[in-house]
Amino acid sequence: MAALGPSSQNVTEYVVRVPKNTTKKYNIMAFNAADKVNFATWNQARLERDLSNKKIYQEEEMPESGAGSEFNRKLREEARRKKYGIVLKEFRPEDQPWLLRVNGKSGRKFKGIKKGGVTENTSYYIFTQCPDGAFEAFPVHNWYNFTPLARHRTLTAEEAEEEWERRNKVLNHFSIMQQRRLKDQDQDEDEEEKEKRGRRKASELRIHDLEDDLEMSSDASDASGEEGGRVPKAKKKAPLAKGGRKKKKKKGSDDEAFEDSDDGDFEGQEVDYMSDGSSSSQEEPESKAKAPQQEEGPKGVDEQSDSSEESEEEKPPEEDKEEEEEKKAPTPQEKKRRKDSSEESDSSEESDIDSEASSALFMAKKKTPPKRERKPSGGSSRGNSRPGTPSAEGGSTSSTLRAAASKLEQGKRVSEMPAAKRLRLDTGPQSLSGKSTPQPPSGKTTPNSGDVQVTEDAVRRYLTRKPMTTKDLLKKFQTKKTGLSSEQTVNVLAQILKRLNPERKMINDKMHFSLKE
């Protein structure tokens, strides 16, 4: 080489020989510097191919002849591949990775993966210096990157799945605890809402424990609930006189609602109470045995009203006119009796002022004329009636009293009457009275004017389909369809549910009723 400058004087020349025909193939083994590979410590090394992927490239072995063989299967398979452009990759052992073991089983393991495309655009050579100082250059055939293998035991698929589930549990522990806190907060809020609902007005339609109590929200249901507890006490106590009833009106209590109601509102309840007490066939012999002694003594209010109603019904129109004339012109004896009865009523008012008007039955009787108050045992309704009673008031309540009397007679003789006569008596008073509260007795249907009837069969059918709340049942029996008021529908449903005794379940903090088929 020619000297180009003072720096070129130290240049040395080397001879590089490249062999034309080489039987050996040279490959490069590349290790990462972080692995800290030290060849000086290698006492033993073993290098072998990893042929575990051979099964992937193997084709299914099918018999060419005999059972299970197909005619020209290989030719047809090749034609199919050419049609769809499928190119099969052959299994080439030289392309498989290397496995390097250093210093036996206890040593390290490396896996060398072939680096593709290294020799496509570049050429790598390995230079070896010969004894004469010249270099021999051998071309690099392949390049392998070696990475160390993990020494610890790897997990199987099942073990890995178990570990993954455990990992999810650990990671989700915080979220689970957070959900619990939120649930506790929701429960506290629900309890507060329940307390608030309990403090609300009783205007909501709800049916509580059917076995113990039927506490309905409407005023009519409250009145019917009070009737059951108050009527037995009313039997023992004498009714109050007219003066006591006037004072009660002045008090302005809740009972004023009953004063403003129409005629016949409590007719159904009166009949139920009276029929329950007198229609049982077992009590009839006892009452017959005691009848001679009781008839001689003073009669009670109910018996007097029954006898007076019977006498009124049996009288022809002419006798009614005569009775009215006699009322207008009172005799001196009647005046004397009237004074005695007023004194008795004042004394009874003072003695029984604490327990006045405890029954819905006597509330309903407030509309009746005062001639049916306390009477002597031998006197009739005509002799003890007060002359000052207006005739319009007696005419307005006559239909209600007649209906009550007929139903009382029906309850007393229910075991003796035939079915046809009983049916006639049932339908008669209802046509006379203006309104009547529907009470479902032993039968399954209730009389109503609408298309849909609130019957026990209908309620059973709804409850056997799916659990329902009382609100859902009230939606099924709407007032437009049944022809009943909301209070009447609530009463009928309450009695039907009490009779069916369905199962109760709490779903979303709401009481649901259901029946099994």
UniProtKB/Swiss-Prot annotation:
Region (Disordered) residue spans: 178-466
Positions carrying Phosphoserine: 217-218, 221, 224, 377, 380-381, 385, 391, 431, 433, 436, 449
Induction: Up-regulated in response to enterovirus 71 (EV71) infection.
Modification type N6-acetyllysine: residues: 407
GO MF entries: DNA binding; phosphatase activator activity; promoter-specific chromatin binding; protein domain specific binding; protein phosphatase binding; RNA binding; RNA polymerase II general transcription initiation factor activity; RNA polymerase II general transcription initiation factor binding
Compartments, as annotated in UniProt: Nucleus
N-acetylalanine PTM positions: 2
Assembly and binders: Heterodimer of an alpha and a beta subunit. Interacts with GTF2F2, CTDP1, TAF6/TAFII80 and URI1. Interacts with GTF2B (via C-terminus and preferentially via acetylated form); this interaction prevents binding of GTF2B to GTF2F2.
Entry keyword annotation includes DNA-binding: yes
Gene3D superfamilies hit by this protein: Winged helix-like DNA-binding domain superfamily/Winged helix DNA-binding domain (1.10.10.10)
Designated gene of the protein: GTF2F1
Any single biological process term in GO: transcription elongation by RNA polymerase II
Bias kind Low complexity: ranges: 377-391
Similarity comment: Belongs to the TFIIF alpha subunit family.
UniProt feature, compositional bias: Basic residues: 232-251, 364-374
Keywords: Acetylation, DNA-binding, Nucleus, Phosphoprotein, Transcription, Transcription regulation
Database matches in InterPro entries: TFIIF-alpha, TFIIF_interaction, WH-like_DNA-bd_sf, WH_DNA-bd_sf
Function: TFIIF is a general transcription initiation factor that binds to RNA polymerase II and helps to recruit it to the initiation complex in collaboration with TFIIB. It promotes transcription elongation.
Ranges of Acidic residues composition bias in the record: 255-270, 303-325, 343-355
One Pfam family matching this protein: TFIIF_alpha
Protein's UniProt name: General transcription factor IIF subunit 1
Residue positions binding Zn(2+): 503, 512, 517
Biased composition (Polar residues): 428-452
SUPFAM superfamilies named among the record's database cross-references: Rap30/74 interaction domains, Winged helix' DNA-binding domain
